């Protein structure tokens, strides 16, 4: 269950299937996968979950905080394996990271914790910048509100004005970039969000077209022509979700499976895009990069 359409989910679905195969499960052979997407519309979640409960699914794999909240509210018996950013204990998903209790466990990323670091990268790339745009998904309020506050605190400490812009569907993207131009924001930082992550290619293309230096979470953004990405690798998170889903299908209880945490943060830089934007990437920043696209 995800806010991302199936045709845009390929890069994440493949590692999920790889994770399932660790326990011997292969789609179409001995396991049926019923993929459900809300296409970024959280109003659809109750109906989606009601149908899954009617079908008596064995496990629910859920990506994104809003999806997990809805799934948790819908059932206390069907195991739920989540992939989320932020603190799953703080959000009430589990009682304890090591002994989750209840019917939820999964994978936690450092999505929220590393977000303010992206503003520091903006400062390194553009030392004279005074104004930055922040793109958030308002339909994901659970993590967005907390992360936005952290970003505003970081912006103040850097002497930078932060303009919060919102997009919960593709039709919002053009107005967002029009606002960036009107506000004269010198860069764009995209918050960690499953829907926004799934639109990496569109956002990278728009950032290039409007000559906006942009920083994203995942490597897909840089591969699509974006300038910089800084965050954990979501594909690895999905592989772990697949492994846990397979273990639960084999009989393990989510209450006994510790929440796994992705802690390795990757920095990717697209030098070709930097050149197109007329930017000179500082050598110390290049030296810290895990991958440089030339």
Placement of each model-derived feature along the sequence:
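Short hydrophobic alpha-helices and adjacent helix-cap/hinge residues
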Residues: 1-294
């Amino acid at each position: 269950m995800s806010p991302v359409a199936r045709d845009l989910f390929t890069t994440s679905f493949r590692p999920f299937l790889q994770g399932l195969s660790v326990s011997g499960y292969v789609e179409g052979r001995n396991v049926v996968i019923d993929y459900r997407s809300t296409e970024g519309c959280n109003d659809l979640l109750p109906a989606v979950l009601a149908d899954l409960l009617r079908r008596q699914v064995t496990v629910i794999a859920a990506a994104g905080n809003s999806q997990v909240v809805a799934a948790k509210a819908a059932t206390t018996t069907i195991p739920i394996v989540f992939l989320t950013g932020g603190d799953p204990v703080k959000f009430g998903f589990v009682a304890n990271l090591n002994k989750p209790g209840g019917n939820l466990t999964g994978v936690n990323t450092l999505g929220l914790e590393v977000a303010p670091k992206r503003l520091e990268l903006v400062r390194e790339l553009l030392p004279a910048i005074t104004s930055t745009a922040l793109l958030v998904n308002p339909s994901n309020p659970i993590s967005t509100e907390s992360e936005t506050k952290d970003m505003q605190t970081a912006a103040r400490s850097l002497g930078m004005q932060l303009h919060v812009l919102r997009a919960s569907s593709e039709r919002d993207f053009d107005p967002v970039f029009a606002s960036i131009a009107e506000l004269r924001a010198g860069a764009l930082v995209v918050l960690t969000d499953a829907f926004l992550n799934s639109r990496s290619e569109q956002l990278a293309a728009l950032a290039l077209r409007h000559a906006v230096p942009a920083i994203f979470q995942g490597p897909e953004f840089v591969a699509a022509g974006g300038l910089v990405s800084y965050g954990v690798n979501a594909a690895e998170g999905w592989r772990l979700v697949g492994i846990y889903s397979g273990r639960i299908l084999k009989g393990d209880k989510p209450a006994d499976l510790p929440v796994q945490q992705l802690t390795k943060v990757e920095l990717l830089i697209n030098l070709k895009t930097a050149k197109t934007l007329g930017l000179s990437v500082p050598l110390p920043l290049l030296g810290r990069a895990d991958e440089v696209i030339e």
